[in-house]
């Protein structure tokens, strides 16, 4: 028996199993992690939505507003640094080319600088998240069919992406405890 936390669509592809229902959709996200000199109008918030950003992102978050340990040790005492993540959504699996990522990163840094969120970026690190948000077609039975097919082969799906559901960290921890308890007696 196997406990699996990989995204359901990837697990189905890896195993070669198929079901009758069409696969449910998902969204991918490009995350720009930015270490920067804090600008004069850098918000104190954990994150903000910007659906009208010219460079195309939808959310900007401030790691260092959540916890200063997201800053380099040398910058924690100074109030002049900020660590940021910037998210841009894409249709599932439609990863941009390296040239597109580079152009987007430059445009995003320029926009954040114009807004006064940052003075200058010191580090920009893009990360592609293939399965970031999962969805279900109305009336879909794909998740149930796929989960049953995998269980028939001893593969038990736990966690947000494996179960193709939106859930928080507490739900994922609960799933882990339940799954571990069910294996304990066998």
Which role does the model predict for each range below?
Residues 33, 111-112, 149, 157, ...:
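Generic C-terminus detector
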Residues 68-78, 129-164:
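FAD-binding beta-loop-beta segment adjacent to the flavin cofactor pocket
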Residues 121-124, 155-157:
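Conserved beta-strand scaffold positions in the cores of enzyme catalytic domains, especially
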Residues 100, 104, 138, 142, ...:
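Residues at alpha-helix caps and immediate loop-helix transition turns in enzyme cores, especially N-
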Residues 157-185:
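A conserved FAD-binding loop/helix module that cradles the flavin
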């Amino acid at each position: 028996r196997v406990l699996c936390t990989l995204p359901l669509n990837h697990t189905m592809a890896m195993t070669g199993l198929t079901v009758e229902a069409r696969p449910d959709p998902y969204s991918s996200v490009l995350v720009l992690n930015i270490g920067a000199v804090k600008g004069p109008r850098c918000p104190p918030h954990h994150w903000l939505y910007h659906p009208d950003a010219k460079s195309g992102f939808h959310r900007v978050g401030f790691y260092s507003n959540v916890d200063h340990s997201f800053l380099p040790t040398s910058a924690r005492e100074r109030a002049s640094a900020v660590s940021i993540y910037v998210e841009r959504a894409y249709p599932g699996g439609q990863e941009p080319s390296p040239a597109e990522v580079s152009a987007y990163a430059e445009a995003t840094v320029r926009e954040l600088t114009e807004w006064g969120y940052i003075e200058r970026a010191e580090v920009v690190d893009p990360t592609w998240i293939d399965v970031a948000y999962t969805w279900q077609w109305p009336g879909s039975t794909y998740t149930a069919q796929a989960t049953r097919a995998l269980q028939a082969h001893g593969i038990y799906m736990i966690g947000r992406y494996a179960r193709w559901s939106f859930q928080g960290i507490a739900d994922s921890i609960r799933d882990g405890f339940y799954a571990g308890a069910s294996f304990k007696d066998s």
